[in-house]
């Protein structure tokens, strides 16, 4: 008789990672879902039902938010919320803040940094080293969005599959697989969550192209969607951690218990490099009225 291993799955994607000018304060977002295999499958089925009912074939993406799919996107977010609150599903988001400036190594490319961040994200964000010990062992299948760089794909897979050793958890096996987010509604919902955070945090609704007055219809729509997602996350946080205040752009505490890295339903992590300089130029008081960067102000 085959022993039943405790099976978990992680889905993760990244957004706002490319340094397209002008730069934004909050960038390098990583968003992911963790859950037991059966609950992740249940979430997938529920999201797919919504997709079929709305009959919208276009990929779910923050950049695709429109009047036509607004209700569809909100339903997907509601569905994720329901599964987080009622089943074994968790959401994790990590990002960087340019107010904490890291001087890159001379030969370090953007992809190198992205690779290192992905590693940190999977290693620390889901608290997998705190997975309850199962007599039959545990397996974690990590599904990442198919990456552009083959060099980093293989390296990242090797690094991540060695994590149970780093965690001193020989009872855990971890496997990494890559999938195309265009075919994965779960990864697409992560894109919505990250897109909303980046839009809201970087105050895109304040931008006024060519000195126009007021928001464009697209800005109004995106702000409405971002606020909807913000309220959803805030509600989950209040329900599951009993927290009164919620900040989308600060790290979630662990209340003195490191197992909460795994136990919490929702966690946010502002990744601050151990070696950094404070750049006050990126703090809200020093941005212009449209939320744009003006100049460096290193402490």
Regions found by a protein language model. Name each.
Residues 1-299:
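Phosphate-ester processing/binding pockets and catalytic centers
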């Amino acid at each position: 008789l085959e022993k039943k291993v405790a099976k978990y799955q992680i889905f993760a994607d990244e957004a706002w990672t490319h340094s397209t000018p002008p730069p934004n304060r909050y960038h390098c977002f990583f968003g992911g879902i963790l859950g037991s295999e059966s609950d992740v499958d249940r979430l997938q089925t529920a999201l797919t039902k919504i997709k079929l009912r709305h009959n919208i074939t276009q990929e779910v993406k923050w950049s695709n938010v429109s009047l036509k799919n607004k209700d569809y996107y909100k339903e997907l977010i509601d569905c994720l919320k329901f599964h987080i609150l009622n089943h074994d599903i968790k959401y994790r988001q990590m990002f960087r803040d340019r107010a904490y400036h890291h001087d890159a190594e001379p030969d370090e490319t953007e992809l190198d940094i992205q690779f290192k961040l992905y590693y940190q994200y999977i290693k620390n964000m889901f608290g997998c080293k705190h997975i309850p010990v199962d007599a039959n062992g545990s397996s974690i299948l990590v599904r990442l969005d198919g990456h552009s760089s083959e060099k980093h794909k293989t390296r990242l897979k090797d690094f991540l599959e060695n994590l149970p050793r780093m965690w001193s958890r020989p009872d855990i096996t971890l496997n990494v697989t890559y999938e195309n987010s265009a075919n994965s509604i779960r990864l697409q919902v992560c894109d919505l969550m990250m897109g909303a955070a980046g839009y809201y945090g970087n105050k895109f609704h304040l931008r006024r192209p060519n000195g126009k007055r007021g928001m464009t219809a697209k800005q109004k729509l995106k702000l409405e969607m971002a606020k909807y997602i913000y309220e959803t996350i805030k509600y989950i946080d209040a329900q599951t951690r009993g927290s009164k205040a919620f900040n989308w752009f600060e790290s979630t505490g662990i209340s003195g218990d490191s197992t909460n890295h795994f136990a919490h339903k929702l966690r946010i992590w502002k990744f601050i490099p151990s070696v950094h300089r404070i750049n006050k130029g990126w703090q809200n008081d020093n941005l212009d009225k449209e939320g744009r960067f003006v100049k460096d102000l290193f402490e």
